Amino acid sequence: QPEVNLGLIPGYGGTQRLSHLIGKGRAMEYMMTGDMIQAEQAMGWGLVNQLYESKEEMLADAQRILQKIFTKAPLAIGQVIACVNGAFDPKTDGYQLEANSFSHLCKSADFREGTSAFLEKRQAQFSGK
């Protein structure tokens, strides 16, 4: 967190997010010393999902993950994003948002397709409806 070296603090919610992600003590240390969080440490704290040896390896894995996500129900993916983001918004009741999302998705064509495909042991063909 080098911002203090420039006479600044981490902006755009950085002080808040880092404190929630790695704890108050660690966040204070890194933000006040200006030390950088090393890749291995970031991995250990859950700040990153994976470490890569090369840009090419990272891009290939990103493509693999995206291709897997693209096979899932678009409405459900959208609601996962909204609910996880809601968990970090103090103005949002994340549990209520999740309940509303679940109820909404249970009425979708994608839910019917997903459950039918599961019972029929086939790959679902989601429509985003």
Q: What are these language model-derived features?
A:
Residues Q1-M31, W45, D61, I65:
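CoA-thioester-processing core
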Residues T15, K24-A27, L59, L66, ...:
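A general structural signal for well-ordered alpha-helical segments in protein cores
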Residues L18, A42, V80, F118:
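Terminal peptide-recognition signature
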Residues Y30-M31, A42, C83-F88, S101-C106:
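Helix-loop "lid/cap" segments that line or gate small-molecule binding pockets
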Residues D35-Q41:
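Acidic, divalent-metal-coordinating active-site segment for phosphoryl/phosphodiester hydrolysis
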Residues S116-K129:
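Terminal low-complexity tails and localization/encapsulation signals of metabolic enzymes
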